[in-house]
Amino acid sequence: MTLLQAIILGIVQGLTEFLPVSSSGHLVLASYYLGWWEKLPLYVDIATNTGTFFAVLVVLRKDVWQALSGFFAGLTSSTARQQEGWRMALLVVLGSIPTAMIGLGLKPIFEELNQPLYVSFALIVTGLVLWFTPKSGLKRNAMSLSWLDATIGGIAQGCAVIPGISRSGSTISTMLWRGATSDLAPRFSFLMYLVVSFGVAILGIDEVREEGLQLAPLLGMIIASFVTGYIALLWLFSVLKKGQFKWFAPYLWVVAAITLIKVAMG
């Protein structure tokens, strides 16, 4: 892999991880249209996710600190267990359990779908989910979300193991349907992403080593995905506040249609 390829893939990941358009699907399509690989190597997903992981840490640093400090304080203090930090931490952990079960159990199967044809159909589904998502929830905050809400959110995130199904789109849409505010839905979604992304990185270390990826391309992917991810994350919060989430759907349908035509034409 060249440094230029690495940077391009990092930019694609950064822009599409947080926007509800499926980063995994776009990485597959970027590779397809540029003629690099028939099947995207798993280490690309791992490396680019490292950059977006740190982008979330920076943007949501207050939420991360509140959840971590609230969790540890709640272990010894009943008063702390009545605070939002403790509640959010437990919800994130609970939501991550079904995600991990789905991911570990089905990822080997769905990795075979890392192809433009399957990605296109998944993008169409993601577009439908976004189109019918309510502009805002029922103003429920973290303290009013239930264990069932978190579990359903985690299942939605697990579905994103399918290339072309947007992780952020699935989880944010689900939480809005469950009544979360347009501010809480993405915060919960991206806190869950931190847990899952960290787990994926740990599990994928050996694969990155086996590939013998050079340091320059590796850093290129990480830095590019971090910078563009930071920008995309800030923009997404603005989009949600304006209730414009559904307008990503037409873009997905156009991309899917163009890709299906190209695949059909060979």
UniProtKB/Swiss-Prot annotation:
EC identifiers of the protein: 3.6.1.27
UniProt cross-references to HAMAP family, sorted A to Z: Undec_diphosphatase (MF_01006)
UniProt entry keywords in alphabetical sequence: Antibiotic resistance, Cell inner membrane, Cell membrane, Cell shape, Cell wall biogenesis/degradation, Hydrolase, Membrane, Peptidoglycan synthesis, Transmembrane, Transmembrane helix
Family: Belongs to the UppP family.
GO cellular component labels: plasma membrane
InterPro entries: UppP
Principal location listed in the UniProt entry: membrane
Subcellular location: Cell inner membrane
Gene that specifies this protein: uppP
Root EC class: hydrolase
Any single biological process term in GO: response to antibiotic
Protein name in the entry: Undecaprenyl-diphosphatase
Membrane-crossing residue ranges in chain numbering: 1-21, 40-60, 90-110, 113-133, 145-165, 188-208, 217-237, 245-265
Function: Catalyzes the dephosphorylation of undecaprenyl diphosphate (UPP). Confers resistance to bacitracin.
Any Pfam family hit: BacA
Note, other: Bacitracin is thought to be involved in the inhibition of peptidoglycan synthesis by sequestering undecaprenyl diphosphate, thereby reducing the pool of lipid carrier available.
